From Swiss-Prot:
Coiled coil: none annotated. Its cofactor is Fe(2+). This is Peptide deformylase. Its EC number is 3.5.1.88. Belongs to the polypeptide deformylase family. Gene3D superfamilies: Peptide deformylase. NCBIfam families: pept_deformyl (TIGR00079), PRK00150.1-3 (NF001159). GO terms for molecular function: metal ion binding; peptide deformylase activity. The keyword Ligase does not apply.
Amino acid sequence: MAKRNIRIMGDSILNKTSKVIEEVTPKIDTLIDDMLDTMYDAGGVGLAAPQVGVLKRLVVIDVSLEGNEPIILINPEIISTDGEQTGDEGCLSLPGKAGIVTRPNYVKVKAYDRHMKPFEVEGEGLLARAFCHEIDHLDGILYVEKVNGEVHEVTSYDEEEEE
């Protein structure tokens, strides 16, 4: 397993539509592991394959506090939503930035696991937001296109402690 470079906004791959995964090859299996390593190392809660330069419909998410409950979504599709939440949203492809985005508060997704077994998963709150955000990446959509108002700078906890 290895960390991969995260593509930053302005890289054209982030604006392209990803291709469906037909089978999990050893290359895709390695990509899944690398994406998890990359996401955890960067302190993110989600990562889509285009963010590491691969135009495949693959997303990894982990919103657990311990960072030990990864959700792997191959060819994910949102099949139902409910409610609404509005809050700050950031992205590993836009480091140091955030913006207010309105998303569904509940989302149900159908996808395939790393063994190409179909499943459905539901999420509320942060998990619902992560589902929407990461699946948008697969269609070349960045959260900045959905921001209410302006994107703003964010500081990390480390920077605040040093002041």
